[in-house]
A protein has these predicted regions:
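Compact nucleic-acid interaction/catalytic patches
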Residues: 26-32, 37-73
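C-terminal terminal-subdomain/extension
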Residues: 69-131
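Short alpha-helix capping/helix-loop boundary micro-motifs
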Residues: 1-5
Length: 131
C-alpha cells in the first residue's frame, strides 16, 4: 500500500523522483533523480513532473539547465530539465523519496526550489518544446 506524502508540493519545487522510462510508462524508474513540479492536482493527490538529468552537455529545444544557485535548488550538480518529458505521478512513496543529504522535510521528498533567475530560461524552453 502506498503512503501519500502530505502536504502536496508547490509548482517550482524540486523533488527526488523515480521518473518512469519512456518504454515503461506507468511504472517507477529504477532509480530516483531530480524532477521539477510544474503543476499540482489536489483532487487526485498527484503532481505534473518534468525529467531531470545531470547530462547537461547538449541542451535541445524544450530543455534548460540549472547551473547556479545549486543550494537553493537542492542539487549536487548542474541539472538539465526536459520539458518535453512530462508525467503526472501520484505523490506517494512509490514514486518519490528523500534525497540523500537533503534536510528540507516539508514536503518530505523536497530537495529545493527552482531559483528565480531560472524562471525566464524555463519559460523560454517551454515556449519551444515539442508539442
Amino acid at each position: 500500500m502506498a503512503y501519500d506524502f502530505k502536504p502536496l508540493p508547490a509548482p517550482g519545487d524540486i523533488l527526488w523522483c523515480k521518473f518512469p522510462h519512456d518504454e515503461d510508462l506507468g511504472n517507477p524508474g529504477p532509480y530516483p533523480r531530480p524532477g521539477l513540479v510544474l503543476n499540482v492536482f489536489r483532487d487526485i493527490h498527484a503532481v505534473l513532473m518534468t525529467y531531470g538529468t545531470s547530462q547537461v552537455g547538449n541542451v535541445y529545444d524544450g530543455e534548460f539547465v540549472i547551473d547556479d544557485q545549486l543550494d537553493t535548488a537542492g542539487l549536487a550538480a548542474p541539472t538539465k530539465f526536459d520539458l518535453n518529458r512530462l508525467q503526472k505521478l501520484p505523490f506517494n512513496d512509490i514514486w518519490f523519496g528523500a534525497s540523500p543529504g537533503v534536510t528540507i522535510t516539508v514536503p518530505l521528498p523536497k530537495m529545493g526550489v527552482i531559483p528565480p533567475i531560472f524562471m525566464a530560461p524555463m519559460r523560454a524552453a517551454w515556449a519551444i518544446r515539442k508539442k
